[in-house]
Amino acid sequence: MTIDIITLTAKQYAALSAEQLDKVRAAQLKKEHLRIYKRELADMAKIGLPSGLQGSLFSISNVLVQSAINGFGQSVMAANTIASQYDNLTYQAMYGISLSSTVFVSQNYGAKKFDRVKKSAYTALGLTTVIGLVLGGLLALLARPLCSFITDSEEVVGYAHTRMLIISITYFLCGLQEVFAYCLRGLGKSMTAMFVVLGGTCLFRILWLNTVLKAWNTLTSLYLLYPASWLLTTLIFVPIYFVCQKKAGKLLEENN
């Protein structure tokens, strides 16, 4: 009896092994399949290249802004570094939401579930706003004690406090800007998102440095550059996104 059970078990194991081997053979890598697929490459480049170019050009405006900050002295430079570390906590929380919105929007768009496309975008916008306002508000409220953990200089703490009062409270605008950009990429409009960010953020900041900051050369006017650029970019994104979303919905209806 025991021998029969062992024999039956061995046969079942052999059958399962053969089945798994068939699956492996079906998924095996063949030399003739190792080639460039033009359509897939074009789709990846259409989405990836604008994002990469945007990041590169964005760095140029950041260098110019950092140069302007450095012009206010060592204490301001130190304060900016400290405040940036705390603001990065808010940014990373919002960035996670905005990045995931691309996945949800693109997958539901590909699955032709347009209601979920809209729900994904609206949920991401709502979550980002709440996270940005709550975390940003807390950081602005606790700016002085938080910065005191890092430095004993009252001057540096004061400069950091000034920055966080202006930027931390309005950081949710940066999150909204990111969500709109990533949702547009999810709809296949990566180039559109790139041009909006480059114009509303990068170009605007360069113009601000050469006009507003030169007329009012104060730390406050320099830091106001950030919320002003986020607000402008978000306001540009709003009509563009909803027009693109509406067109995407009509396209899905026509193809059904």
Model-derived regions: residue spans:
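Residue-level signal for transmembrane alpha-helical positions in Major Facilitator Superfamily
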Residues: 57, 61, 97-101, 138-142, ...
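Short alpha-helical transmembrane segments in multi-pass integral membrane proteins
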Residues: 11-49, 105-170, 212-256
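Structural signal for membrane-spanning alpha-helices in multi-pass inner-membrane proteins
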Residues: 66, 95, 139, 182, ...
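Transmembrane alpha-helical core residues of multi-pass small-molecule transporters
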Residues: 87, 131, 199-204, 229-233
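Transmembrane alpha-helix boundary and packing residues in multipass membrane permease domains
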Residues: 51, 55, 63, 67, ...
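Hydrophobic faces of transmembrane alpha-helices in multi-pass small-molecule transporters and flippases
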Residues: 33-64, 69, 89, 93, ...
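Small-residue-rich hydrophobic transmembrane alpha-helices
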Residues: 79-143, 174-197
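Helix-terminus/linker motif at the lipid-water interface of multi-pass membrane proteins
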Residues: 56-89, 107, 145-154, 213-216
